[in-house]
Amino acid sequence: MKKITLLLLATTLCLVGLNAQDVLTTEEMNSVYKKEKHQNKRVQQYAPLRQADVMWSRKIWREIDLRQKINHPFYYPENDGVAQTIQDRKSLIDVIYSAIQEGSITAYGNATRDDEFREEMSQDAIKKIGGAKEEMVETTNWEKVAEGFSEEESTEMTLSKKEFDRNQVKKWRLKEEWFFDKQRSVMDVRIIGMAPLKEDRDEVSGQLTGGFSPLFWVYFPEAREILINAEVFNLVKNNAERRTYDDIFWKRMFGSTITKESSVMDRKVNEYMVGLDALLEAERIKTEIFNMEHDLWEY
């Protein structure tokens, strides 16, 4: 009798173990192999840099237009009011905005006039990013009206929420510094800050004006701790080679246009050049930086 009981117990335990193994996660069901998480990936450190090693430097501001094909991985998947996740991927604004709400990244306000991280955004300001707001509005309870109450008696105060439409972020502005490190004999660049640019709309008509305004600034070295664990789509269409946003910025795998350089008058390119001339001026600045490094060597 004892042998039969032990045999039944062993059989039951084996069946329970098999059932536990049969329970698959959603991620495992959508792939032929188990994907390792990026949460433990560590940021690649910059090479040590001393002031005495920098023989030349220049600050550059550039904008990444997410409507360009090469920059689509920054924009998709689109947002429907909540952060959309497709195969562990989120858009760049979803990654940054979620980290700001959690307190993992510090957001700096007064973004239109200040890109030097002087003013941290308060919690109230963070809740209002991109026009998001909560307010009490009067609404009519039509069920009460159907029961015979007047519209005035059926009026109620309800909480109305307007979410931050992250799909309107169509550009990102980068502040970076190019420098020549004589210790390593290389021209190098490091991103200092980044800001999402939201499409401007006319307050009366609600129509797009064609302009863009920065919502906030983020200190890039701090954001790297979040970006290193945020997976991004590989445009080579090789899902086995998984990349993160930090990889994309580190390898400069994006298209952009220079909009400003450090100068005595501190002007943007579009303040003294217009249209095609502004694009040519951006190319001139880019070529000037290239020639600066090229002219240091003899061939």
Feature locations, PLM:
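A domain-level signal for the mature, folded cores of soluble proteins
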Residues: 21-182, 201, 220-299
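Glycine-centered flexibility motif
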Residues: 15, 103, 190-193
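Bacterial Sec-dependent N-terminal signal peptides
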Residues: 1-28
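Short linear, low-complexity motifs centered on an aromatic residue
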Residues: 205-222
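Extended serine/threonine-enriched, polar tracts that run as long, contiguous segments within proteins
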Residues: 181, 186, 191-210
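Extracytoplasmic
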Residues: 167-169, 189-191, 213-215
